[in-house]
């Protein structure tokens, strides 16, 4: 028998909460992609820094999409969640992972080796928490002004915009290898 989550509220809201919890609090997810930044071959590619960034991070996005599907699809189907909410939760998971990934690059680029790893992790958690906190605030406003379905749409669009903006802020990191040694 599938766990009945209806006592906790909307099944869609519970699914979104699980997605957010796992995306935010699973710290070991990012893997070893940042070794790409130390690989000189990435910087020798005759391409723009934006494409180099994409080449270095694309597999992490694919991994996030697969992990999100493995997480969201079985729960959403078992709980009979509306397909719009299932797809939205899946994409929100992918965008949250992209925000985590690009925030790590951005914070590491700004702080370089000036602070220890613990301080960099705390700064990164603070920045990620602020970004996600704004998203939660926007979702609450969307629920108050419209309805719960609109909140999913708002979170989805906000996550996409933030992933792109933070990604664009990290592009300079992929220009030349020596800039952050």
Feature map (PLM): residue ranges:
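Hydrophobic alpha-helical transmembrane segments of membrane proteins
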Residues: 1-39, 49-181
């Amino acid at each position: 028998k599938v766990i009945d989550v209806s006592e906790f509220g909307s099944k869609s809201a519970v699914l979104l909460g699980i997605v957010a919890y796992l995306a935010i609090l699973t710290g070991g997810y990012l893997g070893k992609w940042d070794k790409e930044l130390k690989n000189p071959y990435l910087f020798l590619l005759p391409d723009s820094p934006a494409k180099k960034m994409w080449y270095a991070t694309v597999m992490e996005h694919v991994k996030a999409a697969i992990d999100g599907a493995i997480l969201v699809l079985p729960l959403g189907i078992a709980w009979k969640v509306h397909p719009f909410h299932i797809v939205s939760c899946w994409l929100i998971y992918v965008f949250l992972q992209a925000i985590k990934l690009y925030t790590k690059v951005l914070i590491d680029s700004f702080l370089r080796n000036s602070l220890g790893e613990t301080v960099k992790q705390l700064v990164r958690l603070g920045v990620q928490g602020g970004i996600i906190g704004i998203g939660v605030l926007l979702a609450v406003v969307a629920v108050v002004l419209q309805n719960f379905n609109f909140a999913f749409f708002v979170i989805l669009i906000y996550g996409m915009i933030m992933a792109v903006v933070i990604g664009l802020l990290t592009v300079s990191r992929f220009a030349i290898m020596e800039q952050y040694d």
